[in-house]
């Protein structure tokens, strides 16, 4: 079993009977002599989706779990269920709307590349999205000429219903790149 200082973002731990995906790691090096480096890790509970935060010393032993990740494409909606198809063997994976409510805010009509499902012992656990997605602005206040010099933002509604803050110079109809985890504007899409 690895030590806490060997854990990387995206790994899955079995901690206190819960499966936790590592979302972020902050390393805190104390200034006192003999003090151990602390690793503050933010997790997402695989089963419930809740956010969890824990601290570990660098030499703490942690129990990692190997999940199976399968590339999928969005296939269709069947009532309250969303069906994703495995890219290799065409196995269907079904999620209810409640299970992937957060993820649906980032999946444009027709799906997106690089989506994966996480499974463990044949049990479907989660849908994993890439770090960024390109979405179209459908509603926002009109763009202001010369606003690029100021750092003010305005709310914008995107094609999936997600509302984020964007710079004032953007207007409806433009495609922008969004950082999914932080829900923030990164720039115009290519």
UniProtKB/Swiss-Prot annotation:
Tree of life domain: Bacteria
Example of a GO cellular component annotation carried by this entry: cytosol
GO biological process per UniProt: peptide biosynthetic process
InterPro entries: Elong-fact-P_C, NA-bd_OB-fold, Rib_uL2_dom2, Transl_elong_fac_P/YeiP, Transl_elong_KOW-like, Transl_elong_p-like_YeiP, Transl_elong_P/YeiP_cen, Transl_elong_P/YeiP_CS
CDD domains according to UniProt: S1_EF-P_repeat_1, S1_EF-P_repeat_2
Matching Pfam families: EFP, EFP_N, Elong-fact-P_C
GO MF, any single term: translation elongation factor activity
Recorded family membership: Belongs to the elongation factor P family.
Protein name listed in UniProt: Elongation factor P-like protein
Source organism per UniProt: Citrobacter koseri (strain ATCC BAA-895 / CDC 4225-83 / SGSC4696)
Lineage, opening ranks: Bacteria, Pseudomonadati, Pseudomonadota, Gammaproteobacteria, Enterobacterales
């Amino acid at each position: 079993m690895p030590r806490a200082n060997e854990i990387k973002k995206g790994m899955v731990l079995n901690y206190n009977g819960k499966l936790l995906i590592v979302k972020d790691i902050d390393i805190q090096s104390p200034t006192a002599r003999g003090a151990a480096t602390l690793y503050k890790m933010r997790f997402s509970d695989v089963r419930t989706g809740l956010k969890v935060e824990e601290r570990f010393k660098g030499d703490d032993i942690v129990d990692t779990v190997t999940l199976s990740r399968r590339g999928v494409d969005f296939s269709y909606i069947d009532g309250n269920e969303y069906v994703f198809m495995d890219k290799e063997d065409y196995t269907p994976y079904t999620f209810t709307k409640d299970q992937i409510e957060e993820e649906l805010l980032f999946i444009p009509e027709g799906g997106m590349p690089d989506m994966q499902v996480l499974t463990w012992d044949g049990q479907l656990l989660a849908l994993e999205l890439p770090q960024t997605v390109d979405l179209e602005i459908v509603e926002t206040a009109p763009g202001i000429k010369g606003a690029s010099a100021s750092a003010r933002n305005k709310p914008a509604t995107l094609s999936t219903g997600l509302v984020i803050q964007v710079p004032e110079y953007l207007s409806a109809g433009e495609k922008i790149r969004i950082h999914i985890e932080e829900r923030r504007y990164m720039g115009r899409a290519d």
